[in-house]
Swiss-Prot record:
UniProt catalytic activity: cytidine(34) in tRNA(Ile2) + L-lysine + ATP = lysidine(34) in tRNA(Ile2) + AMP + diphosphate + H(+)
Name of the protein described by the UniProt record: tRNA(Ile)-lysidine synthase
Record's subcellular location: Cytoplasm
Domain of life: Bacteria
Keyword Nucleus tagged: no
Binding site for ATP: 20-25
EC id: 6.3.4.19
Class of this enzyme: ligase
Record's comment describing the protein's domains: The N-terminal region contains the highly conserved SGGXDS motif, predicted to be a P-loop motif involved in ATP binding.
InterPro entries found in the cross-reference section: Lysidine-tRNA-synth_C, Rossmann-like_a/b/a_fold, TilS/TtcA_N, tRNA_Ile_lys_synt, tRNA_Ile_lys_synt_N, tRNA_Ile_lys_synt_subst-bd
Species, as recorded: Escherichia coli (strain K12)
Length: 432
């Protein structure tokens, strides 16, 4: 039996296979192992994600380890915890999986997953149920961008029946996830109850939905092409979206621009209602307002007549973080990243009698380099164009009770290095 995967997609010599141990990924890995024998220079690895949702999860790890050992494929096992509020179990598990994939990928390596034609049909129907437009109805692409590399689905044109046939011919063994029989999950409901009925009436229903998905993808690609100049005109060098150029646009054109801007931020596809709210409640809010629309773990805000896509974070104005070993990086609270003092810069290092800390507010009048006279911190933020949501999350370096610098923004006159080896105050952000 010849390989059923689309070998034309496999142009990379480094491949990471998402391997759950189920039928689909077992057939995919088996075919890739065979393909590797024809292409000896290929480096093949597998990754199994342990969600901890099933009592059988440890047994599945053992099964995958045994299979990979037999086929001489290095296996990475990633254990994840699901704790993303506001998402269902399915969405949480998927998010955790793909985060694990992104962490595990090596430079130059591509991710290969085992979705097939029946999966594509289910994805299309789920998008239809949500009322999606062409972008959502495009379902899954055979090749897409992911984590700075590519995600490849070489079985997307094959039915589950073809995979079963392959597995039986080669006497493959796979695991059965008991949750796949739980039709309280939308995808399982479609797989177990709806799609079999549709295919009984129309045997080529899955192929037809795949064609519709491909046509939607084609239309979406054409829209991308036609709107590219508009998007470039509206987008600032910082990646924000300027409101004024969109004021004269039709509602449909404006919504399409906002959707494409969000796609460029790797944001989840917003609903039609969310697009209306972004424009009405954020972009068109009164001038003296600080509008904010929460979308999952992120927010859309307006500042200086621009829309900003940022990760939600709790203000830290009351927080004081001691930095006793200031020669080492300091982890900041609330997922803000880390700071460090690097050799070379215009900030004086602390004296031996000065306790170092990071804070997020500073009282009194401040004297910063490049400005005459004293100003309160709020006024400095305004003059320097620092957005409101960064004002109580930007790390402030203190020696004792003296403000020395704001990371990446300013240095105070008390913090200037004079005739000595200076340091720089560097903030490694983890936020958008």
């Amino acid at each position: 039996m010849t390989l059923t995967l689309n070998r034309q997609l496999l142009t990379s010599r480094q491949i990471l296979v998402a391997f759950s141990g189920g039928l689909d990924s077992t057939v995919l890995l088996h075919q890739l192992v065979q393909w590797r024998t024809e292409n000896p220079g290929v480096a093949l690895r597998a990754i199994h994600v342990h969600h901890g949702l099933s009592a059988n999860a440890d047994a599945w790890v053992t099964h995958c380890e045994n299979v990979c050992q037999q086929w001489q494929v290095p296996l990475v096992v990633e254990r994840v915890q699901l704790a993303q509020e506001g998402l269902g179990i399915e969405a949480q598990a998927r998010q955790a999986r793909y985060q694990a994939f992104a962490r595990t990928l090596l430079p130059g390596e591509v991710l290969v997953t085992a979705q097939h034609l029946d999966d594509q049909c289910e994805t299309f129907l789920l998008a239809l149920k949500r009322g999606s437009g062409p972008a959502g109805l495009s379902a899954m692409a055979e090749v897409s961008e992911f984590a700075g590399t590519r995600l490849i689905r070489p079985l997307l044109a094959r039915t589950r029946g073809e995979l079963v046939q392959w597995a039986r011919q080669y006497d493959l063994r796979w695991i059965e996830d008991e949750s796949n029989q739980d039709d309280s999950y939308d995808r399982n409901f479609l797989r177990l109850r709806v799609v079999p009925l549709l295919q009984q009436r129309w045997p080529h229903f899955a192929e037809a939905t795949a064609r519709s998905a491909a046509l939607c993808a084609e239309q979406e690609s054409l829209l991308d092409e036609l709107l590219a100049d508009d998007l470039a005109h509206c987008q600032s060098p910082q990646g924000t979206l300027q409101i004024v150029p969109m004021l004269a646009m039709s509602d449909a054109r404006r919504a399409a621009i906002i959707r494409r801007w969000l796609a460029g931020q790797n944001a989840p596809m917003p609903s039609r209602d969310a697009l209306v709210r972004i424009w009405q409640e954020v972009a068109l809010a009164r001038e003296d307002a600080s509008p904010c629309l929460r979308l999952g773990a992120f927010e859309i805000r307006r500042y200086q007549s621009q829309l900003w896509w940022i990760k939600s974070v709790t203000g830290q104005s009351e927080n004081i973080v001691p930095w006793q070993t200031w020669l080492q990086p300091l982890e900041l609270p609330a997922g803000l990243g880390s700071v460090q003092l690097n050799a070379g810069g215009d900030i004086r290092p602390p004296r031996a009698d000065e306790a170092v800390s990071v804070r997020f507010k500073a009282p009194g009048l401040l004297h910063i380099v490049g400005r005459n006279g004293g100003r309160k911190l709020k006024k400095i933020w305004q003059e320097l164009g620092v957005p409101p949501w960064l004002r109580d999350t930007t790390p402030l370096l203190f020696y004792g009770e003296t403000l020395i610098a704001a990371a990446g923004v300013f240095v105070t006159q008390e913090g200037v290095a004079e005739g000595e080896n200076g340091v720089s105050f560097v903030w490694q952000k983890t936020l958008s």
